[in-house]
């Protein structure tokens, strides 16, 4: 990546469009999105949140939403995409995953301008419609001055009668959910609003449909990006078995110039809190915290 970034930093790279392709355990994570640099950041525009020509939820399709969040936490300003990387034909219609670019100028340059502005969202449903603004600014925007409040407005619609919206969330640093709309009557209006305090560096929208399809938007960034968070969560058992111990290990990173104190860390299964600790240590500046481990006695998915 250093060699590519060195090439990208040259004047000839100023008008280029670059994307982080299929991040994950199989293909790599670009050194966990290391070597952030403001010039390179301004020339990287996208990261795949999904990839593959297989049917959504089946083999050959590789969702990577957690790596979208990781890249944002590392300070990158990126829009999500959901592409096919198709080696088998049926280019563009092998599955229902789509990249949506918001523009009223469908010329080549108009589309490129929208890509550079990151007015995009990634969806597993081919015709899901999402609109998203914060204080009137479109997705992909940056509010350099931190306002007193954030007025978040979301519109969402699927024209297919057989599809429904089950949940819409505001996602912030480290993948935390800052707000959720899940009342069917409210969701049925397709017009959602909430006012939040500006406590985080970025805010994006995640939509969950009744059939499980997901969509995520580009964020709106607020103030200077805080570059710290979770870099890895691993299970010490390759094949967990119910009733046997399972150790979950969390590694935290801090790319800021000052130390960061961990106020609390919580492990949960859904809404059930398994364990929580306060004053869990300090992540040194430009460093990582020795992994924090939790041993679970049953095989379940665990969230940190």
What is each PLM-predicted segment?
Residues 295-302:
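Conserved small/polar residues in nucleotide/adenosyl-binding loops
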Residues 130, 227-233:
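Proline-enriched interdomain boundary motifs that mark the N-terminal boundary
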């Amino acid at each position: 990546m250093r060699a590519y970034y060195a090439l990208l930093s040259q004047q000839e790279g100023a008008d280029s469009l670059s994307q982080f392709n299929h991040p994950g355990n199989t293909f790599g994570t670009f050194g966990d999105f290391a070597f952030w640099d403001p010039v390179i950041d301004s020339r990287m525009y996208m990261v795949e949140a999904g990839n593959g020509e297989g049917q959504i939820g089946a083999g050959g399709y590789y969702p990577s939403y957690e790596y979208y969040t990781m890249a944002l936490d590392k300070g990158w300003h990126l829009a999500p995409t959901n592409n096919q990387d198709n080696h088998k034909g049926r280019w563009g219609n092998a599955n229902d995953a789509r990249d949506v670019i918001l523009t009223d100028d469908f010329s080549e340059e108009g589309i490129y301008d929208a890509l550079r502005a990151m007015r995009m969202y990634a969806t597993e449903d081919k015709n899901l419609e999402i609109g998203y603004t914060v204080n009137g600014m479109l997705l992909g925007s940056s509010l350099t001055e931190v306002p007193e409040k954030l007025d978040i407005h979301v519109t969402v619609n699927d024209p297919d009668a057989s599809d429904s919206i089950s949940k819409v969330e505001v996602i912030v640093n480290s993948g935390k959910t800052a707000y959720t709309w899940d009342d069917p009557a409210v969701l049925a209006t397709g017009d959602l609003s909430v006012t939040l305090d500006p406590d985080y560096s970025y805010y994006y929208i995640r939509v969950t449909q009744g059939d499980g399809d997901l969509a995520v938007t580009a964020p709106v960034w607020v103030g200077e990006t805080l570059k710290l968070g979770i870099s890895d969560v691993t299970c010490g058992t390759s094949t967990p078995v119910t009733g046997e111990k399972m150790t979950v290990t969390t590694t935290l990173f801090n790319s800021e110039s000052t130390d960061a104190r961990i106020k609390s860390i919580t492990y949960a299964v859904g809404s059930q809190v398994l364990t929580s600790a306060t004053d869990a240590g300090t992540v040194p500046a430009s460093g990582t915290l020795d992994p924090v481990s939790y041993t679970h006695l049953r095989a379940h998915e665990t969230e940190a």
